[in-house]
Amino acid sequence: MILSYSRNLYPQSTGEKIVMGIDWSPNSQKLGVLTADHSLYLFNDQGERQDKIGLRSTEVKSSNKDFIPLCGTFSPCSTLFVVGQSDKVAYIFRLGQLWTDKKSIVARIPMDDAVTAVSWPLSEATSELSPIIFGTASGNLYLYSFQSKSIQAFVSSACFASLASSKTTTADNQATPLSPMSSPIIKILPIPSMPQCFVAVAESGLAVYVDIKTQQLRAAARHSKAVTTACMIAQKTSHGRHYLVLADVMCKVTVYAVETSAALCVCNIKTPQNIPFTASTASPSGGGCIVANASGLHFLTLVNSQPVTVSYEASSSAVTVYQDSGKGFLPQITSIAWRPDVSVLTVGTSLGSVDNFTPTIGSYRYCGAEVVNSAPNRATINIPRFNGSKRFAAGSIDLHASMSSELRTVKAFPKHDFTSFVQNPSGYKSTNIYLLGIGDSSIVIYSLNDDTINEFRYNASLTDKFFFDVGACRTMVISNTLGEFTVCYLTTQSDPGCTFYKVDIYATMRGCVAPHASVISCYPIYEDAAGSLNRISKIRTVCLGEERTDVLVTDLMPPDMCDDFSDPIVVLFRTKTSRAVDWLFFGPSGNAVLLRDISGGVSILNITDYSITQLSTSVGNGVVQWADPFDVIVGQESPDAPLYVWYNPTDIEDAPEILQPPVPVDNESWSFSYVKSNPNNFSKITAGHVKNISVQAIMTTPSGRQTSVSLDTNLLLFNLLLDKHDILGACQLLSALQDNNARVTNRNLWQKLCSVALDSFNFIVASRCYAALGDLPLSITAREIHERVQNAKDGEAGMTHDRMNLYCQAQIALLNSDLDKYDGLMMSCGRIDEVLTLYKELNLYSRAEKICPESMINTLRTEAIQWLINSGQMTTAGMLLAQRGDVRGALDLLIQDRSYLSAFELAKRAMTSSADPSLAPIIELLIGKLEDSHHYSQAAVLCTLGSGRNHERALALFRKSHAFDEALELARQHLPHECLPIEREWAEWLFQTGQYDKATQHYLECMNQEMAVESAFRANNFKLVESLLMDIPAAETNAHLCFRLAEMKYISGDAAGAATWLLKADQPLLGLSAFICAGKFDEAIQFIRSNLPRQSYRELLVHEAKRIISLGSAPSNNPVQEKTKTLTSSGVFASSSGESSEKQNVQSFLNRMESLSHIRGVYSAIELLKLAGLYEDVADILQGNSMWDELYSFAKEHAASFSNYPDILRMVADAKRVKGDKKSCATILEELCMELYGLSGSSSGSSGGMGAATDGYTRLRTQASHLIQARRDVLLEASSMYCDLFMYLEAIRLCKRCGDMDALTDVCLLWVSSNANRSLLIQQLKQLNIIEPTLTKAADRGMWDVCTELSEYCPDPEAVRCDLFWRRGRKLEIEGRLKEAEEFYAKAGKHQEIVGMYLDTGKFEDAQQAAMEMTSNFERERAMRSIRESKARVLASEGKWREAEAEFIELGLVEDIISIYRSNQMWQDALRVAKEHGDSVLVENLSESYVKHDKLRSGLGTSASAFEPGAKADLGDGSGLAGRTKQHGSDVQTARSILEAGSSAGLRKMLMSAARSGSDVLFEVVLHRCAELASMVLNNDIQDSSIVEDIAIISPSIHNFEEIGSPHERVMSLAVAYLSKGVPLSVTTGTESKGTISLIISDVCNREQLLLVCRGVLSLAFVESEYVNRITKQETHGDGIFCRLRSILLSYRNMLLNTVRGTKAAETDKVNFIPGDQELSRCFEATHLIIQLAKLFIGAKTISSMRDIVLVSSSLVRYCDLLPVDRCFVVAGESCKQFVEISNGNSNAKVMEARTQYLNQCCVFLNKFIDLHEEISNHSRNLERIDISDLTGSGIPWTAQVPVNLYLSKSRADEVRAFILELTMDESTTTTQELPREPCPFGCGKPIWIGACSCINCRQVSPICAVTGCHVINPNTHMLPSSRACQICGCYARPAPWNSLITKSKNCPVCEEVGFPIGK
């Protein structure tokens, strides 16, 4: 804020004119200044001095001047001023409203001491009622009542001072005299928001909060120093707080919270020392305050209220305030005051000067005008040349939000109009412009057109929108985003006590879909009809509801004006439109609303009858508006389109008038703009100048031209004429319009005119209207009435005006056919004769009889009867005769008119009253007529009346009419023997007509219980049926009835009753189903326990559970039929009779129960089994439905109830892994590991525990040999998965809990290798004390940098480093990097290892060189001896026996050469050497061995295997079959003996015998059986009988075995299941068990038999759909047949590497995965590539992934001799084709090159497939006729066999053939019929196929890449990679694809262990 000097009000002077007080009046119009020279100066709001009042001393007439005024203030009404003086008196002066009013002293108020403070707040309704508060120098507070002119002591200084030590007190209503302890009251500060409260501030620093109403006092502040001045900052918001500002003698300013009396902050003001603050005042806006002292004014700003922050603005508070005013010195400021509107700050000084300062907060420009914020709640808009307001100074508009503390923003509506107005204020003309000032608590509005200001309290938000003139002038709507809007009316009535006009705020509407001015319209309804009083009673509002098709019409009233019997919102009606509404607007009369929908349609809403009429479907696309002030609508759809004028829009029959627009000028179209009416106000139209009315539609062109089209004034005037009661003129107007055919008038106008004419008794005009409406009779009648009225007026001079009015009203009633009213009115007129004459003419004798005299009644009746007979109304005539007593004549007329029923009633009355014999003939005639007309009951009644009663005839007639009640009553009285037949007949009739409930009782009456039960059934009266069945004895039909009753009870919801009766119907199982279908599982379990045998308890509940599950999965059209047919067909629900009809009834009932039941699905079945305690069956169901989460939770909850709990955890973990939820899988595996740990602990304690553990963990035994190994496998799996998720802490915790140090080191090693901060992790390893085991394992894995770091933390780092060097040398030696190995051996000091390394590789020269470098002679000699020994062994291996023998003998190694001779079966040479160089013992032992060998050889020759006639290949470990047999004992059978006896004993007994003989024997027997199964497949000789036992033994362990359709696949699935899953314990032990015996592949494995199994699996042929959809998915999930075969081969390889033969083969064979075995290696490679291709198929198809698919599928072609040949070629060809398609358009050079290569490869493969398909389709036995020249030298074998079935169907093969033909014929595609080639990677230069792994030129072979299947030879170095890709399985791979795969999956694709990237 900036204070700028404004003007001087009173100049400075010498003497005693010091300013003692300043106060502004509340209305900001008057300023009062008290000076020390005993004067009160008065100034106006412009600062002009108006008056001076001399003050009086204690005595009014005394001239004593020994006093000074100390304080003063205005009254709330601004007409009174009160002054407090030092001479213990106060005066009240009356100033008046105007300056010219007389000034006088109103009251003189004596006090006990000097008056130091005064306040006059508006605490009551008026100033006179509000008390004045005085504070004195003695510290007392007084209340003065202006009304009663009395003063009262309120609070004494003692009471005041007591609050210094207490929190609250009560006013004592006393005063204490001045004492040394007294403290003067210096300020009394009223609280604006609480008029009854104020704060009194004492000079001592104590401030007290006082409540006048409750007389309660509490401390508002306890300041420690004396206070010099005080003020209060009061925020004007509704929740604003009050802050007390105290300035003390130490020049410190402190802010207190009045509500809490807490000190909030201290303001630091830099002023000269010891200059106290003398005055202060708070800003009326609530934004801050000003304190003053000799150094100037200091402005304090309330920055924030949460928390409270008051800052000192130095820039707004400097002493330059007076320097700017031109004064050269700074007088002492004694008093300051704000003007209430915050526009002026008035300052008084010690020199008597009074100055005004103008505060300015800031300025900005808005719409071209400058907006100056002179105060926080005041804004001045400067508009030059604007002088149109009487309220403001020329050139400005002042917006003052007096109810707000801050004016937030200024807005103009409409904004563009205000912008134009600012530019040219004098020349701009607009409808209405409003300026809006939005404050924090109120809104101030200025209307430029009306020059009015309105202000009202409203807390506007930033999202609120304002709309003006909504439907009516000065109507404002405020809306928000919540669908709410508030209607305000800006009145022109002054608000009492305020300078602004009032604003009527109406109730807030809610639920509007889009509160906008376009969909809200208002219409003010005034208290008087003309609206001249300008008092609005309510506002009618039409708006949208919750949808855009919902229109709501309401009447709104201000809520504060409503009483208990009125509602501020009255909903008149709500309606729906067919389309969404775009905008709506009230008509000028408020009786109709114009609606436009979003499609351009225009409708009218009639407020009077709440109807909606559509005017047009398209006019709304243009301009549509009301022709104000008429309810006429004018619209134009588009420029130059006709104008549509609806003169009566609410009339649905009124067609619009079409007016053509003017002819276009200069190709400019005419558009409708607005309607111009003269006059424009309906109230100005008088009867005198009706003809001068003109209404024109103004048309404009784009260039600004205007023209007018006149509307039909006559039609506009019609309603005006009716309103002016000019009926004849209106009739002439309509007649003229109709006669001139100017416009076709509709019926409604004539009807309206007719109604008004009748109301005015103008019958001649009504006659004209009826004629126009086409009702000629009424027109004639109206004319006759007109004549009668005229005659009545002329003929009877005595008829008064009132009687004439009654006569006219009677005629109108006659026209309206209201004869009752006509009678009454005519009788009132005394014209009864005229009425009787009219009634006779109209034959209305009954009405005439009512009003005629008594003498004329008989005559009228006779005339009426005769007229009735003549007119054929004999029935009515007969009734009249009967009334006159002529019964016979009446009956005769009624019979003639065939009114037999009326005649019956008449005859019945006559015969009942008296028996007249003369009536007998006519009665008999009537009975015959009634019987002929089928009125039997009436005829029977007549038969029972009179003297000649005929009861038999009456009974027959009653029974014929089914009136059995009357017939039974008659029979009981007169014919008792007919009662029982009547009851039976009645019951049958009721049964036939469907009245079963009544029929039941009658059947019981006639003693037919069976039909009674049937009727009760059909009446759904089950209680009665139940009671009847209880009484019926047991019979064959009883069960059927019980069954029906049960069915009905179930349908009615009584499941328990249904089960009870089903039990009686011998259907207990159906009763069980009833309970279950009703969801009453507890009752079902209790029922089955009570009524069914115990042994079937579980089976029945499981069966019911499966039925419930089937219901949940059944199709919607027939959900239960297929699921329940098994029950009925097997007789489960059938009775003992077994009849088909009863089965159908049972089936129907069961189907109905299931259809009505909500119990279905897996969860219901689980709930049933859980309640029954069948937990294992629950687990089976959860497993079968793949509900793994539920299975895990349930099993964990009931773990003690499961014998196979570990199995369940294993299954859940596998399912989580398949879903990709590794974290959950790892957690479950951890729990499984802990479970197995407990089992392992219990197994180590006792043998019984081991058996339980084995039975409880059957599935895991297929993966390990015993429970301990199984636990370790799970531990490794769980920890590996944790490591994959980087959850190393969890993995370490698990390993520690299991106590597995090996696994713990593995995890730590992975953690170390994955984290860059190794030092921190190594410290953790040290804490775990596993550094050395981790180092050892890191060395085994080649992690040498980790080993180096770990070695530093070992006790002997140097020794550890030497060991690491040795280990690294050893690893390099294994890899063939001998030189590097020699270097590390040397660093380790292992020179002997160097020699041994070179000896192992046959490099004797390098070995000798290494030996010569040894420093020790002993070591050197030993090394040389080792070299000689190695050379000798080499000579022996090369067959140079003699040279080797000589060398061995020379070295003294006689036993070694003998052993070599012995191993090669050179027994003679061995004996010779032993005899020549050995001792006798050696010779003797050798001779015995020779003899045993001969015996053993002869024994084996007679019992050789069918697959290997000779002995088993020597694995180099020296343990043969005979040795193993000897070890087991003589009582154990061998595999061969078991196999020989197996053909007769059967497979099951053979496996049982093998299991008893040991694991190796069992493996041999099982492998032999698997080989037999494979031979069946390879020879295509499969007999179902030959595999029956295999299916019974092993098929339960195969998932979905029944779904396997191919017999070949079924057989090989059995074989693979034997080897992978083991043999069930139930087979080997003969007892029931779920466990299995795992098979361990050992050295007894027959390689040939295993090869047969591999070939059998690989030869399986599939069709395309099965291979893609089933086989591929199974292999991806890891549970396919190829995955299991790969696991078997990996186990065989591991076993082989643990033997001597395998170790030696691995050292020399780097190509084959299974060392030394090319065939098994090829089988393994083919199996692995099938799995790899399946995993690639499921991924996203990108160029990179498609390249991998092409490489793998092409590599599989190399194994077409093992795999189905057609599948190999077509899969490879299709993969190439897809790559070509997906890479089409790619401009990458490498992609384009690959595309060309693969296109050629695709052509070759698919061509070959077509040839194969044709040969196979022709049933060729071989493929020799196919040309394979294009495959020559590719490495693709062509010894393939014809597959069992074709991979592709004929249609798919035709598609391939068409593609090849199209590719061949396409000239734009250059393809060659040859495979793409590349230079030989081995370096010979021969071009070979890019997919080959061997070269026919250089005979070199490469291992395959585990990722792509291609060779792994580096084309640059022509060598194998320096190291294998996987250090665990030893597979090779190309670096790029391997690293890419490891990045994604983290695992080796072969062994699925953790893999690491490799270098190039």
From Swiss-Prot:
GO terms for biological process: cilium assembly; intraciliary transport; intraciliary transport involved in cilium assembly. Keywords: Cell projection, Cilium, Cilium biogenesis/degradation, Cytoplasm, Cytoskeleton, Flagellum, Repeat, TPR repeat, WD repeat. The keyword rRNA-binding does not apply. WD repeats lie at residues 63-103, 328-367. TPR repeats lie at residues 1064-1098, 1362-1395, 1397-1428. Transmembrane segments: none annotated. It is found in: Cell projection, Cilium, Flagellum; Cytoplasm, Cytoskeleton, Flagellum axoneme; Cytoplasm, Cytoskeleton, Flagellum basal body. Its main location: other. One of its GO terms (cellular component) is ciliary tip. InterPro entries: TPR-like_helical_dom_sf, WD40/YVTN_repeat-like_dom_sf, WD40_repeat_dom_sf. Gene3D superfamilies: 1.25.40.470, Tetratricopeptide repeat domain, YVTN repeat-like/Quinoprotein amine dehydrogenase. It comes from the Eukaryota. Belongs to the IFT172 family. Component of the intraflagellar transport complex B (IFT-B) involved in flagellar assembly. This is Intraflagellar transport protein 172. It comes from Giardia intestinalis (strain ATCC 50803 / WB clone C6).
